[in-house]
Amino acid sequence: MRPDVISSFAYNKIMKFTRTKKVLFTNNKGGVGKTTLAFNCAMSFAKQGYKTVLVDLDPQCNLSRLSLGDNRYEKTLFASQEKDVYDVLKGVVEGGADIDLSVPFIPVPDSNNNLSLMKGSVNLSLYENILVTAYGQAAAGQQLGYFQTSAIDRFLRAKGLDDEIDIFVIDTSPSLSLLNQIIFLGADYFVVPMMPDAFSVQGIENLGSIFEKWKQNWKVTGKALSGNTESKFVLSGDGLFIGYIVNSYNVYGKQPIKDHRHWIEELPAKVKKYLSEKHGRNGLVEKSWKTPLAEIQDYGRIPAKCQEIGVAIFDLDPALVEEIHLGTKENIEKSKDEFGILSDRILKILAEY
């Protein structure tokens, strides 16, 4: 194995939690900044000393591109030694083998050696193809179905234990696909990024109801029929909603513009009814809807530049975009505060629940 591949995990440490935490950033609505939020939040975890792995489960691989930067990502596409999530699943998809636990994570720079990536793959669609049959088999209590549907979750659990990972931050495509259903049923927690607009407010009911349907269906079928099946092959289906993020609000005089403020004020009631009360637990029910985990402003062209070179918004050199974006330095400083609040609140929840 190449030294640069294992460098981020080449030392022993005491885990921050009693077990590895799997946090899913999810929304079936595209354009809400889910991938950008996941990356920047994970980088913030890493800089605070949490051993974190980004897991790219979107066949479009946007998280991989953002984490590595355009140039480095494109080089990995043609490097046979660079493994991705499909290499993990290939034996399960093609038959005759199980998940490949030897597939390494790729270190992400500028993270205090605490952040790595499970690179995405366009071939994830091949895994989704077998899920159509596999989920039906698992729902009927058949062993092959459990084996195939649990593949990603088993990989994360095993690597989390072996590599002493504190947090997996998982990104998926903006859809309600069967692949995303399987990922959702394996997650410990989920966060929902939203835009301050009418479409996000309207979409909360649909999203919360579908998540509830997924959980309930699995509870009365695959989980109920699992019998003596080893627990690691049975998805938990108990993902806890820990909060929402208001992303890309526009500012005027350091406050959200009037139209965005209106929709921000509409969100809590919907979140309470369709997400917190259906997918929360104990004291977290109220905490998860009363206020967002964070409000992240629209940073204009800054995120695009960050993707090009593979850095977090708060780590960007202002000189790289100052000529085309006035106020860049001030915005980058503000992003440190906003993502600091977001990561601190999530970490506190992970410690308590």
What do these predicted ranges mean?
Residues 2-353:
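P-loop NTP-binding core
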